[in-house]
Amino acid sequence: MNKKVKKIFQSNEPYIFLIIILLGIVVQIRSGQFFTANNIVDLLSAMIVPGLFAIAEFMALIAGGIDVSFPALASLSAYATTKFLLDKNYEGNVLLAFVIAIAIGAVLGAFNGYFIGYLNLNAMIVTLGSASIFQGIMQGTLRANQLSVIPPGMKSFGTAAFLTATNKANGLTSILPYTFIILV
């Protein structure tokens, strides 16, 4: 084996990848339902939110820091936006929701950036503290609870099918929403 291949197999990642592939093959052999278009669409759909979070964290890592506040920041931005639009009985398209959520996220990100960039505080400590602050704002100030209704524009955007797959064996239909395009 050459040096590159030896170096690759000195880390854990190739073995984890092989285990995942083997598990997929075993499940496919046992059920016949793993490598179906329906399941692949479901897997892609399930990757949207974690994928967006991973991209956001990757940007922080590239910049030389670490951000542990991004789940709380995203939750606060999404909840505050949705609650605001519901309170205003907004029934327009999703573009306004994106603009508001991005603005809230930018302000909260600037809050972190001030302490990290200008005051030279440790990124891990700042974002850990700001995550607690953001969660406190959601639970204390906004009295966050589960929203059973969302504005129509947000709902239609989240449920509009970019791709549909139907499993002929069991009749299940899966949709890949347009939000997948944002991830890609």
Summary of predicted features, one role per range:
Residues 90-131:
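Alpha-helical transmembrane segments within multi-pass membrane transporters and channels
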Residues 48, 52-56, 77-80, 104-111, ...:
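Membrane-embedded alpha-helical core segments of multi-pass
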Residues 59-62, 91-97, 119-121, 141-152:
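A cytosolic-side transmembrane-helix exit/cap motif
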Residues 1-14, 35:
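Transmembrane alpha-helical segments of polytopic membrane transport and secretion proteins
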Residues 13-18, 43, 72-76, 95-103, ...:
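Hydrophobic alpha-helical transmembrane segments
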Residues 7, 124-184:
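Transmembrane helix-bundle core of multi-pass membrane transporters
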Residues 27-30, 35-88, 114-121:
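Single transmembrane alpha-helix segments in multi-pass membrane proteins
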